């Protein structure tokens, strides 16, 4: 697995200055830089994809550590185009944050940034640029894969709600889980992924983690619940019912 160096508060000033200087040379004008919080609904990407390993790491750090290093954007009218921080902006949007800290570069009156089409952050897709060896980070990546998978199936964006779900409200969607897989989990460190139907949450990723939480005597497990603005009937619900799966105890450990 390659080494990933994420942006930090310590090097933000240097990164912003470097980007601003490059644009000033290209456009032959002086830019102003303002630090503020901007609405994510007005933030648009300038890149075509997200790196799989970096995205998983950013996802983990935002959830676990409230990683909030400002992104760098250029303002064009009422829109903001990301120059540095696509992964941070994408994850915050998926987690349903409304704003993000940003260093905003602005052109003087009479000068504008190049014309660029507006694309939704949600439309960015992961590109497999490097394998992930770390098992914990790989589990975070699987949650993102689940989101992409369901977006491809239903052709709508999905978002993630971080919640604590009671184990009694979980419904498995696979009949078997290997005992070795459960035993390998010493502590439940990664949220499960699930969808809600009625009062129940159907597990999409994290069966072994859920069973381990039960073995540890926990009543709740942290979960990322997939949400969409569209009304969706999840086929996985009917599949679970057809297999006779209604509670964690219905899983056969092999």
Language-model features, listed with the residues they occupy:
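Short, charged/polar connector segments at secondary-structure boundaries
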Residues: 1-83, 87-204, 208-227, 233-236
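Extended, charge-rich low-complexity interaction segments
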Residues: 136-140, 249-254
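Long, compositionally biased intrinsically disordered regions enriched in Pro/Ser/Gly
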Residues: 240-245
């Amino acid at each position: 697995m390659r080494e990933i160096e994420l942006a930090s508060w310590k090097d933000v000033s240097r990164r912003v200055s470097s980007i601003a200087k490059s644009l000033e040379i290209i456009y032959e004008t002086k830019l102003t830089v303002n630090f503020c919080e901007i609405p994510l609904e007005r933030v648009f990407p300038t890149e075509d994809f997200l790196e799989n390993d970096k995205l998983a790491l950013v996802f983990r750090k935002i959830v676990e550590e409230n990683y909030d290093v400002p992104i760098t954007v250029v303002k064009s009218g009422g829109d903001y185009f990301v120059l540095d921080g696509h992964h941070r902006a994408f994850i915050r949007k998926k987690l349903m944050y409304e704003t993000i800290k940003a260093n905003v570069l602005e052109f003087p009156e009479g000068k504008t940034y190049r014309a660029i089409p507006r694309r939704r952050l949600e439309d960015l897709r992961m590109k497999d640029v490097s394998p992930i060896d770390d098992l914990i980070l790989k589990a975070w990546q699987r949650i993102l894969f689940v989101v992409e998978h369901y977006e491809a199936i239903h052709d709508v964006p999905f978002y993630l709600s971080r919640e604590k779900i009671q184990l009694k409200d979980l419904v498995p969607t696979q009949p078997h889980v290997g005992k070795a897989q459960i035993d390998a989990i010493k502590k439940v460190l990664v949220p499960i992924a699930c969808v809600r139907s009625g009062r129940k949450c159907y597990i999409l990723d994290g069966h072994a983690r859920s069973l381990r939480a039960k073995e540890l005597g926990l009543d709740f497990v942290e979960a990322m619940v997939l949400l969409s603005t569209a009304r969706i009937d999840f086929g996985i619900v009917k599949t679970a019912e057809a297999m006779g799966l209604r509670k964690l105890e219905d899983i056969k450990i092999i």
